[in-house]
């Protein structure tokens, strides 16, 4: 399973966010602009696919409905494009749906839904699910069939979800793969100190609810191959670290506590990871999340501001190491750091356009304008990312500049 892109609209302060996902991508904007809302919108869209009845009702209740005057009450739209393997052959898919939020006297419901697929040799997509209205859903019943068989499905349930739960249906194999997609929005804004707490600390969902220290110990004792990969990556990330050893201590009464012992260069003996710098702990935290996603074949993870607490000189190494070791897991992150931007390609960056309308508008630089921006950056002896950080401040309230240099969605 691979994810190639998302489109989201009509949630929080998001209007028409269209993201093409590379191995590593970043949403770049000032604080309070809406970067986190884009991640939450994607999380919401993926989560609704596999949500149970009570959770669907709660999600449709309108908590995330846009209250911006320009988009108030607008339906939520979600589209996900990617590739899945069917019978040994890779196929492209585009799955989308639209939800009407619950309002006074009206329950939330599915308004529209579509699933299209094609093989790499096909010119056109084949329609597999076509739900033009809440109560009007058509599906493909067989390999040779057309998308013309009526399919009854409750108003607040996606047809794809119903098919994934029905083992005997023709589309079950396709639907089950999309239904099972995980795109975790990881809590990387938190101080990593709590995740390494010897006394227990906070469990993390992608780590099976374990603390980081316990997960690292389980990895060491149960998955030697991935543990070796993790240690190799950490030694590259933190050159002063000479030894890395997750440990368990059994206490009277059967209780166990977990710790990670670190031996640093110039230190006479190992110490607990709690004594490591915040930046080093954060790099261990982020890299472990990437390894966990890799082990579970998670197609994409979302991270908030990975540069926090990390020295600017270490950011490039952190990005490269995370990207290389995550393998097929793509990374979508948020950032407001010019130091991080200097290590990204233009195709990896989505900039928040300062249109001052309360909505989050994210766009990429128009490829035809890159040569001019690179020249301007070179004249000032800046990297492209550094120049763009200042450029975004200059285009505020200048709609002509935004239209000239950015792809309009």
Where would I find each of the regions flagged by the language model?
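Electropositive, glycine-dotted interaction segments
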Residues: 89-236
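Phosphate-binding glycine-rich loops of NTP-binding sites
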Residues: 21-63, 283-289, 337
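C-terminal lobe/lid and adjacent interdomain/linker elements of RecA-like ASCE P-loop ATPase modules
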Residues: 316-409
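Extended helical coiled-coil dimerization/tether regions that scaffold
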Residues: 205-273, 393-394
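ABC ATPase nucleotide-binding domain "signature" loop
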Residues: 29, 305-310
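GG-anchored amphipathic helix commonly corresponding to the ABC/SMC/Rad50 NBD signature/C-loop
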Residues: 257-267, 272-303, 313-315
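N-terminal pre-Walker A segment at the start of P-loop NTPase domains
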Residues: 1-15
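Conserved P-loop NTP-binding catalytic core
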Residues: 39-107
